[in-house]
């Protein structure tokens, strides 16, 4: 598992959650990934940025192998409609570009599976919660999210919030 994040703290967290290699940018990851995969590149590339830009698509497709899949989960602006990619390589290498939200599955099917993984200790949800906030401090949570200080921040509601 290769994780790419400009935030050093988040790269450290990625290693704790199972990443074997981390890089600060897609550009800095290309050469090591070529070496690591003997030029084959990644079967699956998942773009999960907070503010998706069309320019990320071509970089991510560069990291994607022939017949591989690049999945976009990050949300961009509805006004950002430009995506740059090499159509020749995209077609000739038979790559797939897929949009995705919430894993693309059915919540009725996937939720019981995820709960089972959580109960068995294989899905580490509690460890991903780095900070809890009261409703009164929701703005602090939002600021911490924008500053890259959390893996996940959680708003804890109390009876007084109702």
Question: Residue locations for each model-derived region?
Answer:
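Short, local alpha-helical segments
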Residues: 93-100, 123-124
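Conserved Rossmann-like nucleotide-cofactor binding loop
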Residues: 9
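Short coil/turn segments
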Residues: 75-78, 102-107
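Conserved beta-strand positions in the Rossmann-like core of class I SAM-dependent methyltransferases
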Residues: 2
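Conserved beta-strand scaffold positions in the cores of enzyme catalytic domains, especially
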Residues: 21-22, 97-99, 128, 132
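C-terminal hydrophobic helical "lid"/dimerization subdomain
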Residues: 27-28, 58-62, 104-162
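Conserved acidic E/D residue at the C-terminus of a beta-strand in Rossmann-like folds
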Residues: 5
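Glycine-rich cofactor phosphate-binding loops and adjacent beta1-alpha1 units
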Residues: 12-13, 17-96, 161-162
């Amino acid at each position: 598992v290769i994780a790419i994040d400009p935030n050093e703290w988040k790269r450290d967290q990625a290693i704790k959650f199972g990443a074997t290699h981390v890089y600060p940018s897609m550009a800095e990851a290309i050469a090591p990934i070529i070496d690591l995969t003997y030029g084959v590149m990644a079967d699956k590339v998942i773009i999960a940025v907070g503010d998706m830009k069309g320019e990320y698509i071509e970089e991510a497709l560069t990291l994607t192998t022939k017949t591989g899949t690049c999945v976009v989960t990050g949300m961009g602006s509805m006004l950002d409609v430009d995506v740059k990619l090499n159509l020749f390589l995209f077609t000739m290498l038979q790559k797939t570009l897929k949009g995705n939200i919430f894993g693309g599955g059915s919540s009725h099917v996937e939720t019981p599976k995820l709960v089972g993984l959580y109960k068995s200790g294989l899905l580490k949800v509690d460890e991903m919660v780095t900070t809890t906030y009261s409703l009164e401090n929701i703005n602090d949570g939002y600021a911490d999210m924008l500053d890259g200080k959390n893996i996940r921040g959680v708003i804890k509601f109390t009876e007084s919030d109702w």
